[in-house]
């Protein structure tokens, strides 16, 4: 399954369809229709959160899905498919790719990422596993553990990389990631325009994931209202 899945997403756009519990669009049904709309627009894959959303999306579309499970634990900052329990639950949906936090941070219950990956590969040998990384150190770590794909998902979202953007310094972090691993790199995180998506693919990324810029209306609206607000601020000077 691995090679055919990789061919399907190569050079394409994966749309992240997620809405958390405190967001207006939080609904498996709504996410399934969001995914359908994304595929109709040309998306070659979908990234989705929770088994419930994934199964609803699977009933609507027939493209590869990157599955995750966002869950908070009191004893760790790791929240993207953080423990073996969540990894297994997402694998059981039959998604082609499962992504998980692959930072060097302490995991909930002191679970070990190497042990998680080793155990789950025995249970689901045909599933591909994607490492959501923040720093270059994370990339080396994930590479050494044998992840199938490396994502830049958490760049700008960890304590070490806080407030950084993938496009900073002419995409310097992404360029370093591409030099640091021979595994397929999936660009993800703060890719908020078509031009950015095109540029990361031109640099050599295998595929690109875009989320909020496509599927979070409140974020899209805020970008417009922030610009409009500047008119009032300029007039007030």
From Swiss-Prot:
Pathway in which the depicted protein is active: Amino-sugar metabolism; N-acetylneuraminate degradation; D-fructose 6-phosphate from N-acetylneuraminate: step 3/5
GO biological process: carbohydrate metabolic process; N-acetylmannosamine catabolic process; N-acetylneuraminate catabolic process
GO cellular component: cytosol
Protein EC: 5.1.3.9
Enzyme class: isomerase
S-S bonds: none
Pfam family, one: NanE
Family: Belongs to the NanE family.
PANTHER family, per database record: N-ACETYLMANNOSAMINE-6-PHOSPHATE 2-EPIMERASE-RELATED
Database matches in HAMAP family: ManNAc6P_epimer
Protein name: Putative N-acetylmannosamine-6-phosphate 2-epimerase
Species in which this protein is naturally found: Listeria monocytogenes serotype 4a (strain HCC23)
High-level lineage: Bacteria, Bacillati, Bacillota, Bacilli, Bacillales
């Amino acid at each position: 399954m691995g090679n055919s899945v990789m061919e399907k997403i190569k050079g394409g756009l994966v749309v992240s369809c997620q809405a958390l519990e405190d967001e207006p669009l939080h609904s498996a049904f709504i996410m399934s229709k969001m995914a359908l709309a994304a595929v109709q627009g040309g998306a070659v894959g979908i990234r989705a959160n929770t088994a419930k959303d994934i199964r609803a999306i699977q009933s609507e579309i027939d493209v590869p899905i990157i599955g995750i499970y966002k869950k908070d634990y009191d004893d760790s900052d790791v929240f993207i498919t953080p423990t073996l329990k969540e990894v297994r639950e997402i694998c059981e949906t039959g998604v082609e790719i499962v992504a998980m936090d692959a930072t060097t941070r302490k995991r909930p219950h002191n679970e070990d990422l190497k042990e998680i990956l080793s155990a789950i590969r025995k249970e689901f040998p045909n599933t591909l596993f994607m490492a959501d990384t923040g720093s270059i150190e994370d990339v080396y770590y994930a590479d050494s553990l044998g992840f199938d794909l490396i994502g830049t998902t958490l760049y700008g979202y960890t304590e070490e990389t806080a407030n950084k953007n993938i496009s900073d310094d002419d995409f310097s972090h992404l360029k370093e990631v591409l030099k640091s691993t021979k595994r397929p790199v999936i660009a993800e995180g703060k890719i908020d325009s078509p031009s950015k998506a095109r540029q990361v693919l031109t640099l050599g990324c295998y595929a690109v994931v875009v989320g909020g810029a496509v599927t979070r209306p409140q974020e899209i609206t805020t970008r417009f209202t922030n610009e409009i607000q500047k008119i009032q601020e300029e007039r007030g000077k």
